[in-house]
């Protein structure tokens, strides 16, 4: 099936030069692979067999393509179709209207030409053709939650013409003035629950939902919702399995946009709400989470907002969002990556090469999960692509280190890099400089153990490390600052409020609450110091060219080197000297000193390492 594209879709991109996409950008902006899903309800509900009123009844069978041509089709009002093939999606004129009874009856697809109401057409079902002629069938998809019922009737298409006929299930009227503007009226709307995909009973707590999910969310926000997932916090939520895991069901409620106090704008309530158009500038600074436009308005655009945030353009659009602390904590706990295994059998005692091979391999695996975790931090995907890459490159080793500290908190004297990779201090002596880093890590683990770090505090500190790394420019001459630092500050405020909220509800006295908060935040400076030490050590290992490094780890390492070129470059000079060049496992040649190339202002989202020749992989910046 051929789908005609408009001129705007095939026009060349303007402005941005072509370049190869980096490994980090591919992980950040890669969309999930979608596979066509079978309808959860019987097909008869989506494509009901209908009978037109009057004397005769025309029977339609939409699945096998059968159509009774002998039965007359009579309706309460005449339906029209267009015979002009110039613009299949435009409104037909009065002169191009012909009565449906004056031409052979055939397959018609009734859709709307309005971009807000017209569903997307995609080839999904292919019923057999009639009379040996090719037929076109469409599976009606919408980008939003509601699915609209449309009638699909059979038609004979000429091989030389493409006719897309437009009508509706109800009576359509065309105005006689002008070019014949159509008035589209939707007859029936079937809406589904955004949480479990069951039939929605109404608009509850900011989204369309069923009675079961509405009642479950009401009970959860009114009482204690200390649910625990027995699996990996990724349980499937549908009509049959929604009761199997309360934790994942509540997480799905928050993800689809359920909020306490969500209210439809087109319905009155017990509290009269002031129209936003008359609020003025003061009302747009900070708004409660229940009054947000994209939360309280019915979902019209579906997932359009989530996809537009990664296009690298606008970044944060809209007012500063204030999210409830309970929701922030719940989302951060649900975003935690799963436990990893090294799956590499290396005989002990370790040598320098085997030790660093194990550690760099684990770091590369954790980086992939770290990027997936960062995309689940509340507000992170609303940032521009430049800011996302900047934050990840600035904090990746600190995030990995605090995760290592949390895994090792219950094992004194041990560092748990993975479930099957547990090291102690003595095993770090095989690598020069590694024992010092191990000592600092074990001391920080002991400090967190003494403070009895809670899981809620850990997830908050981890997110603070990610967002605080790019709050201020490391070097104003060599690093481009964040495009929207105010959005990052707003995200930091939400997470800090969540940390304070948890400490205040932990049972500590009023005097101990600010003291504990200060004790936790002061330890982040020690993690930053360990990260700098580890970065210097990794860069020296790369310059020695003894251990193969992976593409993503190399890009992260070199991106951090641009942000703090002084210390890391000095480590490279002390290790190899200015004339040494090392070759990575991917074949790219990198020198420890690049002269003026390391001090230029970095382009938004551009990677430092260019793997291979940028010939066929060049594409516009997304």
From Swiss-Prot:
Q: Where are the zinc fingers (NR C4-type)?
A: 193-213, 229-253
Top-level taxon: Eukaryota
Bias (Basic and acidic residues) ranges: 283-296
UniProt key word Zinc: yes
Return the annotated DNA-binding positions.
193-258
Give the subcellular location: Nucleus
Q: Where is this region: Hinge?
A: 259-323
Residue ranges of region Disordered?
A: 1-53, 78-112, 275-319, 565-622
Q: Which InterPro entries match?
A: Est_rcpt/est-rel_rcp, Estr_rcpt, Estr_rcpt_N, NHR-like_dom_sf, Nucl_hrmn_rcpt_lig-bd, Nuclear_hormone_rcpt_NR3, Nuclear_hrmn_rcpt, Znf_hrmn_rcpt
Query: Residues in domain NR LBD?
Result: 324-560
- What Pfam family is a match, any one? Oest_recep
Note what the entry says on domains.
Answer: Composed of three domains: a modulating N-terminal domain, a DNA-binding domain and a C-terminal ligand-binding domain.
Q: What is the protein's given name?
A: Estrogen receptor
């Amino acid at each position: 099936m051929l789908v005609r594209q408009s001129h705007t879709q095939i026009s060349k991109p303007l402005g941005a030069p072509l370049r190869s996409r980096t490994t980090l950008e591919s992980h950040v902006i890669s969309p999930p692979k979608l596979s066509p899903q079978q309808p959860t309800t019987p097909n008869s509900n989506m494509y009901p067999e209908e009978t037109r009123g009057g004397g005769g009844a025309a029977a339609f069978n939409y699945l096998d393509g059968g159509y009774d041509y002998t039965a007359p089709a009579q309706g309460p009002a005449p339906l029209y179709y267009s015979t002009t093939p110039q613009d299949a999606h435009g409104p037909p004129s009065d002169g191009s209207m012909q009565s449906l009874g004056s031409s052979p009856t055939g397959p018609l697809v009734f859709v709307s030409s309005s971009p807000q109401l017209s569903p997307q057409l995609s080839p999904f079902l292919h019923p057999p053709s009639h009379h040996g002629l090719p037929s076109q069938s469409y599976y009606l998809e919408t980008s939003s939650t509601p699915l609209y019922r449309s009638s699909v009737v059979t038609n004979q298409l000429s091989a030389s013409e493409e006719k897309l006929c437009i009508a509706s299930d109800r009576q359509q009227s065309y105005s006689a003035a002008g070019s014949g503007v159509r008035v589209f009226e939707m007859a029936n709307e079937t809406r589904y629950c955004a949480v479990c995909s069951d039939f929605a009973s109404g608009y509850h707590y900011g989204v369309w939902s069923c009675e079961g999910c509405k009642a479950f969310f009401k009970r959860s926000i009114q009482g204690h919702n200390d649910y625990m997932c027995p699996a990996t916090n990724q349980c499937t939520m549908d009509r049959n399995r929604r009761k199997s895991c309360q934790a994942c069901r509540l997480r799905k409620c928050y993800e689809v946009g359920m909020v306490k106090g969500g209210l439809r704008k087109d319905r009155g309530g017990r509290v009269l709400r002031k129209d936003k158009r008359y609020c003025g500038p003061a009302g747009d600074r900070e708004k409660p989470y229940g009054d947000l436009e994209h939360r309280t308005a019915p979902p019209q655009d579906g997932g359009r907002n989530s996809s537009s945030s990664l296009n690298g353009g606008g970044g944060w659009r809209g007012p500063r969002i204030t999210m409830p602390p309970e929701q922030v904590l719940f989302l951060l706990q649900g975003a935690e990556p799963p436990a990893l295994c090294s799956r590499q059998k290396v005989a002990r005692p370790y040598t320098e090469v085997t030790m660093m091979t194990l550690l760099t391999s684990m770091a590369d695996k954790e980086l992939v999960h770290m990027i997936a975790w960062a995309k689940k931090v509340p507000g992170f995907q609303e940032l521009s692509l430049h800011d996302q890459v900047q934050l990840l490159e600035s904090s990746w080793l600190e995030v990995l280190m605090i995760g290592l500290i949390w895994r090792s908190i219950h094992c004194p004297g041990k560092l748990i890099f993975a479930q099957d990779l547990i090291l102690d201090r003595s095993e770090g002596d095989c690598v020069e400089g590694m024992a010092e880093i191990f000592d600092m890590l074990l001391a920080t683990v002991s400090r967190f153990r003494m403070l009895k770090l809670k899981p809620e505090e850990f997830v908050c500190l981890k997110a603070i490390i990610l967002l605080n790394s790019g709050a201020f420019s490391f070097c104003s001459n060599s690093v481009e600052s964040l495009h929207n630092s105010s959005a990052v500050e707003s995200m930091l405020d939400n997470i800090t409020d969540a940390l304070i909220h948890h400490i205040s509800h932990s049972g500590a006295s009023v005097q101990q609450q600010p003291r504990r908060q200060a004790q936790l935040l002061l330890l982040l400076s020690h993690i930053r110091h360990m990260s700098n030490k580890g970065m210097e050590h990794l860069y020296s290992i790369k310059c020695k060219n003894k251990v193969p490094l992976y593409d993503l780890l190399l890009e992260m390492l070199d991106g951090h080197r641009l942000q703090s070129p002084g210390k890391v470059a000095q480590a490279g000079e002390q290790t190899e000297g200015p004339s040494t060049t090392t070759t990575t496992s991917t074949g790219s040649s990198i020198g420890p000193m690049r002269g003026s190339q390391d001090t230029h202002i970095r382009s938004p989202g551009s990677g430092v390492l260019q793997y291979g020749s940028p010939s066929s992989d060049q594409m516009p910046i997304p």
